[in-house]
């Protein structure tokens, strides 16, 4: 397994941006096993962090590096700042995630070009980014994982709190994310709910969707509402609830469930940089 820290120049963001990449490339077969074909590209998960996070969050909070190696899965973890993974006046974070990042990593690493091998996931703000960009760029992504997601925009964004200790709750930041007309944002492609309705009306092919939320999570009702919308629009999906709140213990457990839900096979055992003999 190779763990890479990468910086590259992004045209969408207008600056150099960091990301962390897991590549299960150096695994040596055990005696009697056949090596993985060198020309076989890797299935890929683009994994997005939550608010105030960075491209190292998933490595620190979960066992993703071991689970990825066990499944011969490449994992790309970009730094999304506090952008909601939406295009804003200064940086096109949505296009960066949905187009530029995928194009760059496919050119740079041995990743599959196929939609059915390309997945996007995230937690909290990253879950929102995965839903929004997975749906907007549905021709690129074959599956979406949304854990404890800010699943949809609703009237809550019209009532910011200027006294909140969280900058993302303030009016200026919300207008930066969603535009000056917050009511219009509710009916735009910034809202995953609108994208669901639009794609359903068009008869488009939806990515497979996996959602999970803790039963004590403050975002539980938003997740239930989005689940109900998917049911109303007859969109196949998996929605799971379990004990826990907005915390890494829950995300670690349900990330494994999500990986088991993806069309991945457990790879043959081998020796790599993560093994100690």
Language model features: what each stretch is:
Residues 1-277:
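Non-catalytic cap/lid and distal C-terminal segments of serine-dependent acyl enzymes
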């Amino acid at each position: 397994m190779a763990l890479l820290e990468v910086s590259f120049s992004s045209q969408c963001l207008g600056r150099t941006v960091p990301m962390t990449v897991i590549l299960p490339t150096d695994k040596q077969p055990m005696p009697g096993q056949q090596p993985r074909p060198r020309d076989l590209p890797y299935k890929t998960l683009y994994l997005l962090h939550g608010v105030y996070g960075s491209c190292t969050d998933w490595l620190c909070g979960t066992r993703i590096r071991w689970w990825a190696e066990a499944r011969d899965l490449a994992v790309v973890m970009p730094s999304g700042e506090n952008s909601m993974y939406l295009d804003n006046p200064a940086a096109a974070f949505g296009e960066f995630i949905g187009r530029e990042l995928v194009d760059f990593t496919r050119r740079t690493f041995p990743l599959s070009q196929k939609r059915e091998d390309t997945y996007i996931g995230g937690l909290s703000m990253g879950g929102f980014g995965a839903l929004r960009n997975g749906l907007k760029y549905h021709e690129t992504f074959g599956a979406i994982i949304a854990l404890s997601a800010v699943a949809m925009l609703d009237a809550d964004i019209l009532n910011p709190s200027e006294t909140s200790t969280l900058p993302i709750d303030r009016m200026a930041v919300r207008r930066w994310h969603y535009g000056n007309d917050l009511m219009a944002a509710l009916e735009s492609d910034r809202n995953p709910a609108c994208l669901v309705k639009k794609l359903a009306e068009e008869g488009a092919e939806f990515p497979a969707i996996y959602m999970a939320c803790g039963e004590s999570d403050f975002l539980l009702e938003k997740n239930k509402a989005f689940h109900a919308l998917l049911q109303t629009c007859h969109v196949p999906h998996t929605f799971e609830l379990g004990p826990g709140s907005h915390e890494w213990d829950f995300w670690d457990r349900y990330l494994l469930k999500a990986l088991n839900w993806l069309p991945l096979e457990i790879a043959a055992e081998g020796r790599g940089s993560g093994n100690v003999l």
